Amino acid sequence: MSTQIMRQLWSIIEATQVVTLLQMDDTSLVQWLVKQTSKQVLLESHELDFLGEYIKTRLTLIRDLADERSN
């Protein structure tokens, strides 16, 4: 996955309201983040799959960062 896609994903995470990141279930959050990223960066199907898997492995980190922002 390109650095452009990674930067865009983390930019989206930072810009997303904390309540969204904390209250969505895992599957919905992964799908939502993939969709938001694909709106801004043209992704091929294998990149969509990889991005979804990457997000799944980072959900704890994403939620921890969101929790920090809420305090």
Residue ranges and their predicted role:
Residues 16-17, 38, 56:
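N-terminal functional modules and adjacent low-complexity/disordered segments of proteins
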Residues 42-71:
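Short, charged early-sequence alpha-helical segments and their helix-coil boundaries
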Residues 1-28, 63:
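N-terminal acidic leader/helix
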Residues 18-21, 40, 47:
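Intrinsically disordered, low-complexity regions
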Residues 8, 28, 32, 50-54:
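Amphipathic alpha-helical interaction segments
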Residues 31-40:
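DNA-recognition alpha helix
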